[in-house]
């Protein structure tokens, strides 16, 4: 766990970025610029299925070649090359009939947001999500130099382009402010908010992690953790550090907590947020 009194320290948000993308996509649904349950043109799946990891999109981060390339500090592949390597045109299962976590699916979500907003991702997220919540520390990492602004630096030369859906960096406080705002303010309509947190149940306890029930909403991990009940947010990780940002609505005084830790075990950050609450 990284402990500091400096509120301006920058951390990689890793897959917590997915929650921001999902929020932006649902804001566009609310504005009538995207459809949640209509099949996408020339695709077999819907936006809802992408957000809930039920579209069958093959996950590029499972590729051995991807792992080697990241370890070798290589530049990211071109998007088309990545899609070819993971056979993205061939769904792993019929959309809606299964569940499998997919970073590739969220690249498609990114493309949908940029097209519907007629803007680049960073600008779209600022306008759709961060401005309404008065959040100003968050930015989209595009270069190795951007990664070096984070508290741990970037000695391993990691390129954020490997997170094809977009890797956000920001303060721990703004991670909490974003998720707390999403959970307690009206940034989404009541109907869309309810759909976002509605869980697709996945399984039971996970060894080394605090989960008792695992589930996924629309861009949200939303199962139950030891001692705190419902746990709504997202964990994430990359080379050498991990994060967990969660809202706990069932504790006596509902609270939102974030933990950013060195290492590669997301369970460490998840256990830390539980400890901070109980």
Protein language model regions, located:
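Short, charged, amphipathic alpha-helices and their helix-cap/turn boundaries
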Residues: 1, 67-94, 119-141, 146-152
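Catalytic loop of the DD-peptidase/beta-lactamase superfamily, centered on the K-T-G motif
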Residues: 1-4, 8-12, 119, 156-278
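Active-site-proximal loop and beta-strand segments within enzyme catalytic domains
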Residues: 5-101
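Secretory-pathway/luminal and periplasmic proteins that interact with or process carbohydrate-rich
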Residues: 55-62, 132-142, 201-208
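Alpha-helix boundary/capping residues
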Residues: 23, 54-57, 89-90, 128, ...
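Short, contiguous, pocket-lining structural segments
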Residues: 74, 97-105, 117, 160, ...
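Short, well-structured active-site flanking segments
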Residues: 27-44, 116-144, 189-194
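Alpha-helical scaffold elements that line and support the substrate/ligand-binding pocket
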Residues: 14-34, 50, 86-87, 100-129, ...
């Amino acid at each position: 766990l990284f402990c500091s009194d400096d509120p301006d320290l920058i951390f990689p948000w890793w897959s917590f970025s997915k929650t921001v993308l999902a929020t932006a996509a649902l804001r566009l649904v609310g504005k009538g610029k995207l459809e949640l349950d209509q099949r996408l043109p020339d695709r077999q799946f819907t936006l809802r299925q992408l957000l809930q990891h039920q579209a069958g999109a093959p996950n590029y981060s499972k590729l051995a070649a991807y792992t080697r390339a990241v370890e070798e500090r290589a530049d990211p592949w071109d998007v088309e090359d990545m899609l070819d390597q993971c056979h993205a045109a061939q769904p792993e299962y019929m959309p809606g009939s299964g569940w499998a976590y997919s970073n590739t699916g969220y690249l498609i979500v990114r493309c949908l947001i940029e097209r519907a907003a007629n803007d680049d991702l960073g600008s779209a997220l600022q306008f759709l999500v961060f401005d309404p919540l008065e959040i100003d520390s968050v930015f989209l990492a595009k270069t190795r130099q951007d990664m070096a602004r984070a508290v741990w630096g970037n000695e391993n030369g990691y390129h954020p382009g490997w997170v094809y859906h977009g890797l956000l960096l920001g303060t721990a406080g703004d991670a909490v402010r974003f998720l707390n705002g999403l959970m307690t303010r009206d940034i989404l309509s009541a109907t869309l908010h309810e759909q976002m947190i509605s869980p697709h149940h996945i399984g039971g306890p996970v060894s080394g992690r605090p989960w008792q029930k695992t589930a996924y909403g629309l861009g949200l991990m939303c199962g139950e953790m030891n001692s705190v009940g419902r746990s709504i947010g997202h964990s994430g990780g990359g080379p050498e550090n991990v994060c967990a940002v969660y809202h706990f609505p069932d504790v006596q005084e509902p609270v939102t907590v974030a933990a950013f830790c060195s290492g590669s075990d997301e369970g460490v950050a998840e256990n830390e947020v539980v400890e901070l609450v109980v």
